[in-house]
Amino acid sequence: MRKIKSLALLAVAALVIGCSSGSKDVEQASVNELYTKGTTSLQEGSYSEAIRYLKATTERFPGSVYQEQAMLDLIYANYKTQDYTQVLLMVDSFLHQFTQSPNQAYAVYMAGLTNAATGDNFIQDFFGIDRATRETTSMRTAFSNFQNLVRVFPNSPYSQDALARMAYIKDALARHELEIAKFYAKRKAWVAVANRVVGMLKQYPDTKATYEGLFLMQEAYEKMGLTALANDTQKIIDANKDKTFAPIEKPNEPDLKVPAVK
C-alpha cells in the first residue's frame, strides 16, 4: 500500500512539475520565442499547442510587430480545433484592432465559414422527424458574413467561394421554410401556410423550394375561400412550370491558408 501511495505521489509531483515548466515556458519566454514556437506548431498541425503560444504572444505583447499575424494565425488554429466561439471572438477583435488591414477580408470570410460550420448540424439533420422549429440563426449570420465580404471586398480571393456558399445557404434556408409551411399545412393552419410562402417569395424567389411552396399557398387560399388569390397563385405556377432548378451542392471545405502580413 505504501508503495502504491509513493508511486501516486511521484505521479502527482511529476504532473505539477510538468505544468509548472509548461507555464514558465509561456510566462517567461520572449515575444520572438513565443511567436516562433507558435508558428512552428501551426505548421506541424499541432493546433492546440500553437494556440497556447500565439495567445501568449498577443496577450503578453499586445503591441508587438507580430500582433496582426498572430491574431490571423489564432483565427485559423481555433477554426481547425473547431473552437468556433473563440474564432468569432478573435475575428471581432481583429476587425476592431486592424481597421485598415487588407486582411480584413480573410477575417470576415473565416467568420462566415465558422457560422456556417456552427449551423451545419441544422443542414445535416434537415429532413429529420420535425424540424419546423430548428434554429437557423447561425446559417443566416453566415449568409450575412459572406454577403458583406462580397460587397465590401468584391475582388478578394475569397469572394467566389463566398458566392457559392451564399447560394447553398439560401437554398437550404428556403427548403427549411418549405418544411415549416408543410408542417402548418398538416395542421390545417392555412393562414400560417400562406404567410410563410409569401415570405419565401420575398426572400428566396429563385429557389426550387419556393416554387414548390406555391402549391401549398394555392391550397391554403382555396381552403380559406380566397378564390381570386388562389387563381393568381395558379397563374404564377403556370408561368414558371418550365423553369429548371440546377441542384446546389454543398461547397467543399476550402483549402485554407493564413495570409501573410506585409
From Swiss-Prot:
Tree of life domain: Bacteria
GO cellular component: Bam protein complex
Lipidation (S-diacylglycerol cysteine): C19
Keyword Signal annotated: yes
Covalent lipidation (N-palmitoyl cysteine), chain numbering: C19
Record flagged with keyword Lipoprotein: yes
Main location: membrane
Keywords for the protein's UniProt record, in alphabetical order: Cell outer membrane, Lipoprotein, Membrane, Palmitate, Signal
Topology term for the membrane: Lipid-anchor
Assembly: Part of the Bam complex.
Protein name in UniProt: Outer membrane protein assembly factor BamD
Organism field: Haemophilus influenzae (strain ATCC 51907 / DSM 11121 / KW20 / Rd)
Lineage: Bacteria, Pseudomonadati, Pseudomonadota, Gammaproteobacteria, Pasteurellales
Name of the gene this protein is made from: bamD
